[in-house]
């Protein structure tokens, strides 16, 4: 499960998920990518489930890059606890994903195999996703 080694603050504000992704919106390492079409919090368990789904399908064929990391702690108070008495303790970690963010990259496999691996990974995530090729995003960026 992904989580930071050390953090400055154990509890953070919820923040805003408005707008598009300005960073991490290009395929940089691999040939193919999985792009988010909606804004959401992606938990470390969901990232791990998507990674396992991809690597099991491509077997030893290609290489997978995870381009999102869960930096944000989500707190929760125990069940049947009265309101007040401070903020709850950190329960799990999430990555804030905005539309346009490339979440996973893949290289070393054919396009058909990459498309199917990304489809399996997208089913593990709580948002709509799109399969992209490196050339497609470079053409859009050059306009």
Curated annotation (Swiss-Prot):
This is Large ribosomal subunit protein uL16. Binds 23S rRNA and is also seen to make contacts with the A and possibly P site tRNAs. InterPro entries: Ribosomal_uL16 (IPR047873), Ribosomal_uL16_bact-type (IPR000114), Ribosomal_uL16_CS (IPR020798), Ribosomal_uL16_dom (IPR016180), Ribosomal_uL16_sf (IPR036920). Part of the 50S ribosomal subunit. Pfam families: Ribosomal_L16. GO terms for molecular function: rRNA binding; structural constituent of ribosome; tRNA binding. The lineage of its organism: Bacteria, Bacillati, Bacillota, Clostridia, Peptostreptococcales. Belongs to the universal ribosomal protein uL16 family. Keywords: Ribonucleoprotein, Ribosomal protein, RNA-binding, rRNA-binding, tRNA-binding. The keyword rRNA-binding applies. The keyword Magnesium does not apply. Residues 1-14 have a biased composition (Basic residues). Residues 1-20 are annotated as: Disordered. It comes from Clostridioides difficile (strain 630) (Peptoclostridium difficile). CDD domains: Ribosomal_L16_L10e.
């Amino acid at each position: 499960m992904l989580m930071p080694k050390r953090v400055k603050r154990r509890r953070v504000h919820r923040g805003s998920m408005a707008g598009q992704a300005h960073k991490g919106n290009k395929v940089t390492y691999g040939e193919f990518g999985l792009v988010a079409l909606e804004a959401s919090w992606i938990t470390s368990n969901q990232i791990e489930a998507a990674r396992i789904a991809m690597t099991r399908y491509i077997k030893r064929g290609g290489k997978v890059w995870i381009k999102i990391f869960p930096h944000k702690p989500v707190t929760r108070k125990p069940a049947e606890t009265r309101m007040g008495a401070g903020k709850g303790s950190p329960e799990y970690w999430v990555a804030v994903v905005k539309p346009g963010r490339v979440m996973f990259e893949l290289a070393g496999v054919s396009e058909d195999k990459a498309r199917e691996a990304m489809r399996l990974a997208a089913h593990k995530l709580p948002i709509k996703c799109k399969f992209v090729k490196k050339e497609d995003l470079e053409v859009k960026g050059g306009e």
